[in-house]
């Protein structure tokens, strides 16, 4: 059995095909979804989604949103997302370095929160392509 997975951002359809299983990051932790999953709606955290298709795993960096699961149909609405094959390693590493520097220089609560979110997004891009953020120092 398979699941119909659709990942949509405001600008484009990022994924629209059958998969065997997914694992997503929610605000309360990671959640695995298999065929005939109970119906629910959940917030999606900034994090890596793992997708199993034809017995192989791939990943996608999700930048927050919502997921609606209805038995064998999953619709994920995200602010932005990038498939692992579309992420440029050097660009992701540079984004991580800049985000880290911004966090160090942040002054005031708002700047710290914004810099922390930017760092989490940058780290997620690296994790989606299996590059350790510590490799980007």
From Swiss-Prot:
Write down the membrane topology.
Peripheral membrane protein
Query: Per the record, what is one GO cellular component?
Result: proton-transporting ATP synthase complex
Record keyword Transcription regulation present: no
Query: Which domain of life, per UniProt?
Result: Eukaryota
Record's Gene3D superfamilies? 6.10.140.480, F0F1 ATP synthase delta/epsilon subunit, N-terminal
Output the Gene Ontology terms for molecular function.
ATP binding; proton-transporting ATP synthase activity, rotational mechanism
Provide the protein's localization: Plastid, Chloroplast thylakoid membrane
Q: Which UniProt keywords apply?
A: ATP synthesis, CF(1), Chloroplast, Hydrogen ion transport, Ion transport, Membrane, Plastid, Thylakoid, Transport
Keyword Ribonucleoprotein present in the record's keywords: the answer is no
Pfam families membership: ATP-synt_DE, ATP-synt_DE_N
Q: Which SUPFAM superfamilies would you find in this protein's record?
A: Epsilon subunit of F1F0-ATP synthase N-terminal domain (SSF51344)
NCBIfam families registered for this protein in UniProt: ATP_synt_epsi
Q: What does the annotation say about its assembly with partners?
A: F-type ATPases have 2 components, CF(1) - the catalytic core - and CF(0) - the membrane proton channel. CF(1) has five subunits: alpha(3), beta(3), gamma(1), delta(1), epsilon(1). CF(0) has three main subunits: a, b and c.
Q: Which family does it belong to?
A: Belongs to the ATPase epsilon chain family.
Database matches in HAMAP family: ATP_synth_epsil_bac
**What is the role of this chain?**
Produces ATP from ADP in the presence of a proton gradient across the membrane.
Query: How is this protein named in the record?
Result: ATP synthase epsilon chain, chloroplastic
Q: Which gene encodes it?
A: atpE
